[in-house]
Amino acid sequence: MAPRRISVSETSRPVLPRHARLKFDETRQRWVILAPERVLAPDEIAVEILQLCDGARDVAAIIDALAVRYTADRAEIGRDVVAMLQDLADKGFLTEARETTP
């Protein structure tokens, strides 16, 4: 089944799809996203954002955490985070967590 593509907003709960994983590559000494036949090397800030994309937190909570951590303007961080996550979603490296049924 193909991953669901998402339109990222502050209410989205992003997560890496099952076929992709974020891993520290010892050989390259950098973080990479591994997917079938593809490797993406995100920068340090993207890695920090991706580590918060656990499917439990929504984008608003991720933005809030980063704004507090860096004592930065929430609106500016929000624009950057949503744009980065949307770019990854468009490339198939990010999807939205599904609701779990009891």
Swiss-Prot record:
Annotated Gene3D superfamilies: Coenzyme PQQ synthesis protein D (PqqD)
Protein name, as recorded: PqqA binding protein
Highest classification ranks of the organism: Bacteria, Pseudomonadati, Pseudomonadota, Alphaproteobacteria, Hyphomicrobiales
GO molecular function: quinone binding
HAMAP family: PQQ_syn_PqqD
Top-level division of the source organism's lineage: Bacteria
Pathway listed: Cofactor biosynthesis; pyrroloquinoline quinone biosynthesis
Gene Ontology biological process terms, A to Z: pyrroloquinoline quinone biosynthetic process
Family under the similarity heading: Belongs to the PqqD family.
Pfam families assigned: PqqD
